């Protein structure tokens, strides 16, 4: 096994074709990390000109110290049962990490627990410290240890039927409601950033500046690995649909009124049907007024939601999503998710990753809502083998990875106690 010098294109081709490859190991992903102070080095190993393993090493300087952290996000990309290739990758990583004064090499392979026995054993044998099997969104990890994934290598009906029953009904309703899902361009990021700000204010989290999303789009879109989707509501088109539905409801009422006059047996049923239709008419009249007001203010329509869809070979990722507070009954997110899954499948993906989650958290958990949303899309829990550290500077590692977090937790506890007094 020997070190190899390969191009960025060869590196990406290997990552995209390998079962353990991941978006975070693509060379263009490293470009997106520059804004936050990371820089990259890449390594490859193989035999007789054939690549057998690669890794993208991200480095970031430790504040106020002449040291760095080496982070191989979702790497190494290698067959973990191939001890020779794994050992060669570690040797190459150590050589570069030491030159960059890294205190540790941190990895979190895209390898699931039920397939990771070799990986776990072989990494430990090489001297890696395993950080345990904690909850998926544990703050002790950089990347989530658990994600929710939908298999999308099936036709439209099979895909829809893989969703939970209630969610399936919502998707069907969303398709009828009259929104349009657009694959947008870079200009659409302005709208997306505005929707993200609204989402952050509603759900209570800090949002990224538009430059962050532009950075991702610019780096990965050219290779087809980043797409922006937006969902639009056209008031004129939907006013016409509401008028049609109102006409149908009035016709239905007339039909049941006639039955009431001709059949006493059906009188009770007819009255129930009339009441139901009248309730629907009231709701549609309210909706029509809202749409007419929207048409006056925004005759061209408004965007209700958006998302970034990412790719790495046969894997697709729902990376960021945002939505408006208006017209939520139109279920724009449901329309968008189903459309993005189909788009991903049509462009070679077999899986659709919803991102991080815990495993069946309690209802009072801060992560319950996230899990509840992701579980209804025909997903399975992808539990990874977790995070590993290869220590290069033990005193500094202990200070940064162990002592400092304890001090931070202690400060938080003291602060909370003082606030209670």
Swiss-Prot record:
Reaction(s) this enzyme catalyzes, per UniProt: beta-D-GlcNAc-(1->4)-Mur2Ac(oyl-L-Ala-D-isoglutaminyl-L-Lys-D-Ala-D-Ala)-di-trans,octa-cis-undecaprenyl diphosphate + glycyl-tRNA(Gly) = beta-D-GlcNAc-(1->4)-Mur2Ac(oyl-L-Ala-D-isoglutaminyl-L-Lys-(N(6)-Gly)-D-Ala-D-Ala)-di-trans,octa-cis-undecaprenyl diphosphate + tRNA(Gly) + H(+)
Transmembrane residue ranges: none
InterPro entries recorded: Acyl_CoA_acyltransferase (IPR016181), FEMABX (IPR003447), PG_Glycine_Bridge_Synth (IPR050644)
Keyword hit for Nucleus: no
Keyword Cytoplasm attached: yes
Primary location group: cytoplasm
GO cellular component terms, A-Z: cytoplasm
Domain of life: Bacteria
Entry's family note: Belongs to the FemABX family.
Name listed for the protein in its UniProt record: Lipid II:glycine glycyltransferase
The organism of origin for this protein: Staphylococcus aureus (strain MW2)
Taxonomic path: Bacteria, Bacillati, Bacillota, Bacilli, Bacillales
UniProt gene name: femX
